[in-house]
């Protein structure tokens, strides 16, 4: 089923011209854009550009997600108001998106009058329809800051494995989920105080209402991605299971956001007004351009609406958001497209290794944004698979594909054409069999882009580029140019080469828009669209002098980029330590600790005797098999050879840092005499050792210990 099958073209639109609203998830307004974020914005932008090139009426909408406790606390830390913070961050985000060619039709903010009005309207419609309930709940409360604490703002000791400094909802070591009240020795991340329990009246969206379940079961059947459909069916359960829980949509003051109508001191939870921000940004655009906003969002609208998101927020976009829209009288999304996460060189992005790369640092290092656009596109497909930015492969692929195969075609032909033929192509050569092959491939390449199979589109394009280069190598224009008698053959070769280059540029335009602009200027042609595949270069229009369109990646640029991002961690933490205190020095102490990647929280661990240490049996283990644990976002299941008659089974909370295939064959260190523990996924017969920073927020990353290659399974560590 195609998108046009789901939503036919609106009455009054030109035949075949679709009306499309597309969004990316809203970046949170308390930090910088990094390359992990850019995966999604580049993916969406390529799709939006593809649809524009078809001539469809499409609007790519975005905004900063500005509300919530983290923004409020970040502003307090910086000594500014939340509004001052989000205004500054908006400018930074807009700069970064512009740098990478992300072509929003409107990039707005959720802290707007439009968003407040729309959020209130949707809430009141849901309330009138019987979907809002009020009930008393008990929460953790910080007595020092006098505020209720979200789960992620409480830390303590895991009640299961007793790992320290775990969040209030789940343990990152053993993968157990729990309530904040289950933590041992809990403390507030904000002030360090011990939380107390307080009750408060909260507002809930009744997702458990049978009407919601019935609607969502029908709506899920239209999702394009099988992984998303399967996940939703897992959340919904079988008919009659009633697995959906009501959703808490309110927060207590102090809170930066919109106050709930008729409920003083209560605010909309950020995840209610954030998706409404899609519509608010579009409404702002409609008012400026004279578009009929209601015709796009009303329940009977026949326009199309697509959301590109990360797979980590699928729950919000496939349960809450469509249900909110359905029962408040609005149209629901045509589809939701989720992508995977980004790793760098096979591991989670790391500040200590310099692979936590910000968008601005990439630009500052002098790297071309279109290199990254191309590399990400080459890795992306229509699934939710994670993608890896391998920096050596990045350099090799850009240099080989974009410079060696693509722009090299123009540089080999343009000089001869200008010098020998006044820059004009040979009219009869534009129907060469090679060019027919390229023209015939353009619709398929465009279809790959629309289906979000960017990797396929680029593989096909580079295969065509290989064919063109093969043609040039066989024709040898540099040899033909030596003899005036070969003028006709030379003219034909240069014409075929340059027309082929035009067609390759058309195929690459959604990915390389700035290069495409340069090509259009060089060839003296109007902006390329898919319909231009059959409009060859005119012999009446001379080309202009060739200008370099792309340079090679210099490995020194990559080295400088990594070094800059390593040093930025030190600089940011030092600045925080110097300027950010909360009266008792807790914030400064924490920041100073983050500035030293090797620092550890020594004072939290009392001394033990050598006899105590001798009780721990540390052994070398070889990972002979590894797999993800179904139903867990954090655990990997390891099969370990520890020199015994049979292997051991161990569950480890390291999924965020490693792909299973990366670990197979590695040696590591395990606690061999840890009592076996029965988990819901099976029996864990030990623990592998891993290292992480004391302040994981300032320096994320998890690293298993790897002994010297001379060590063998079963050897004791002593």
Curated annotation (Swiss-Prot):
Q: What cofactor(s) does the depicted protein rely on?
A: Zn(2+)
Chemical reaction(s) catalysed = tRNA(Met) + L-methionine + ATP = L-methionyl-tRNA(Met) + AMP + diphosphate
Which InterPro entries does the entry mention? aa-tRNA-synth_I_CS (IPR001412), Anticodon_Met (IPR041872), Met-tRNA-synth_bsu_C (IPR004495), Met-tRNA_ligase_1 (IPR023458), Met-tRNA_synth (IPR014758), Methionyl/Leucyl_tRNA_Synth (IPR015413), MetRS_core (IPR033911), MetRS_Zn (IPR029038)
Any one GO MF annotation of this record: methionine-tRNA ligase activity
Q: EC number(s) of the enzyme? A: 6.1.1.10
Free-text remark on how the cofactor is bound? Binds 1 zinc ion per subunit.
Cellular compartment(s): Cytoplasm
Q: Which UniProt keywords are given for this protein, alphabetically ordered?
A: Aminoacyl-tRNA synthetase, ATP-binding, Cytoplasm, Ligase, Metal-binding, Nucleotide-binding, Protein biosynthesis, RNA-binding, tRNA-binding, Zinc
UniProt binding sites for Zn(2+):
158, 161, 171, 174
Amino-acid positions noted as binding ATP in the UniProt annotation, renumbered to this chain: 351
Q: Motif 'HIGH' region at which residues? A: 27-37
**Residue interval(s) of motif 'KMSKS' region:** 348-352
Q: Where is the tRNA-binding domain?
A: 612-718
- Its predominant location is cytoplasm
Give the GO terms filed under biological process for this record: methionyl-tRNA aminoacylation
EC class of the enzyme, as a word? ligase
Q: Can you list the GO cellular component terms from the UniProt entry?
A: cytosol
Q: Which family does it belong to?
A: Belongs to the class-I aminoacyl-tRNA synthetase family. MetG type 1 subfamily.
Q: Quaternary state and partners of this protein?
A: Homodimer.
Q: What does this protein do?
A: Is required not only for elongation of protein synthesis but also for the initiation of all mRNA translation through initiator tRNA(fMet) aminoacylation.
Protein's name according to its UniProt entry: Methionine--tRNA ligase
